[in-house]
Design a protein with these regions (language model features):
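Conserved small-residue-rich beta-alpha loop and adjacent elements
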Residues: 88-153
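NAD(P)-dependent aldehyde/semialdehyde dehydrogenase
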Residues: 249-255, 260-300
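Residue-level signal for short, function-critical loop segments
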Residues: 111, 137, 226, 263-264
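Structural signal for hydrophobic packing residues in well-ordered secondary-structure cores
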Residues: 56-64, 154, 158, 204, ...
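Conserved NAD(P)+-binding/catalytic subdomain of aldehyde/semialdehyde dehydrogenases
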Residues: 159-258, 263
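Glycine-rich nucleotide phosphate-binding loop and flanking beta-alpha elements
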Residues: 112-113, 195-197, 267
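N-terminal Rossmann-like NAD(P)+-binding subdomain of aldehyde/semialdehyde dehydrogenases
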Residues: 1-103
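Glycine- and small hydrophobic-enriched segments that form the cores of compact globular domains
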Residues: 141-148, 155, 160-164, 171
């Protein structure tokens, strides 16, 4: 916010609001975003926040659509009351000092991992902050289901105050919008790798703003052939590998790009592993034309 001699210049506020009107709001409003800077911070693991997340979990688990999205089911399980209490015990400070949130957190979620935005939001809420989260611009089914569950939970009278602490937004790449949201922030969380970080760094943040970035990184898997052949849950291993790799079309940083085999019976283990994975891929994986184009572009 620009000031001159201690007086706020309203022209800049007006320009900022015009930029905010370009945004599509899934939860929240332009006025709500402007008001976030004045919201009081909360203590970590605020009871109302915990209750809200548990309510979202219940709604998701009762939604039949969730059965086809293992990542949404994982999220619903993660935010249930029992797990939040476990996280709370891990977070508890031994010195008994009072902890408070820092303020307004601006999250830029990755475009290729549908549910990441929700995990980032939950961490922001549980640490006592108000949150503006840019969700993927692509219309993922998982995003729709989670947003609808949150909207439903926020309609309950006991959780309406949480509404002020959440803005889920969608907009195409726009540096002016990034500028407005960044200069409001007390925390900026950038997912999406090196190129996203480089672009967001063109948008200045306040001197006291904390920035958390997730740069490019790659994963590999190491499989002990002898141990693998000795376990009964080979179908479960194939399912987990599929979820980590094919579910995000190998775009997530946790998706293995290399598999290293160890042990004496490597060839036998490879044959069993790949056959089970092939059966699963044939049943579940849809190779869309846009995926082929993206892979070809990356290869070139």
């Amino acid at each position: 916010m620009q000031k001159f001699g201690g007086v706020v210049i309203p022209m800049q506020q007006s320009l900022d609001k015009e930029e905010l009107k370009k945004i599509t709001y899934l939860i929240g409003t332009a006025d709500g975003i402007c008001a976030m800077q004045k919201l009081p911070v909360k203590e970590p693991f605020d009871k109302k926040t915990e209750g809200f997340l548990n309510e979202v979990s219940k709604i998701l688990m009762a939604d039949k659509r969730v059965k086809i999205y293992s990542d949404v089911m994982t999220f619903a399980f993660w935010i249930r009351k029992a797990n939040i209490e476990q996280l709370k015990r891990r977070f508890k400070r031994k010195d008994n000092d009072i902890c408070l949130g820092k303020g307004l957190a601006f999250h830029i979620a990755p475009s290729n991992v549908p549910v990441n935005f929700a995990f980032s939001l939950v961490v922001g809420l549980l640490t006592g902050n108000s949150n503006i989260v840019r969700v993927p611009s692509k219309e993922f089914g998982q995003v729709k289901i989670i947003v609808e569950a949150m909207q439903k939970a926020l309609l309950k009278p006991e959780y309406r105050e949480i509404n002020s602490y959440i803005a889920l937004i969608r907009y195409e790449r726009d540096r002016q919008i990034n500028n407005v949201l960044s200069k409001m922030s007390d925390i900026r969380v950038i997912w999406g790798g090196d190129s996203t970080i480089e672009e967001l760094r063109h948008s200045a943040i306040p001197p006291r703003c904390t920035e958390i970035t997730f740069a490019d990184r790659y994963s590999l898997a190491v499989i002990d052939a002898d141990v693998y052949l000795g376990i009964k849950e080979k179908d479960r291993v194939a399912e987990n590998f599929y979820n980590d790799t094919y579910f995000s079309d190998q775009n997530a940083c946790t998706s293995p790009r290399v598999i290293i085999w160890t042990g004496k019976k490597k060839e036998e283990a490879k044959q069993v592993f790949w056959e089970k994975l092939y059966t699963l891929v044939e049943q579940k994986y849809v190779f869309q034309p846009i995926k082929a184009i993206n892979k070809l572009t990356s290869a070139c």
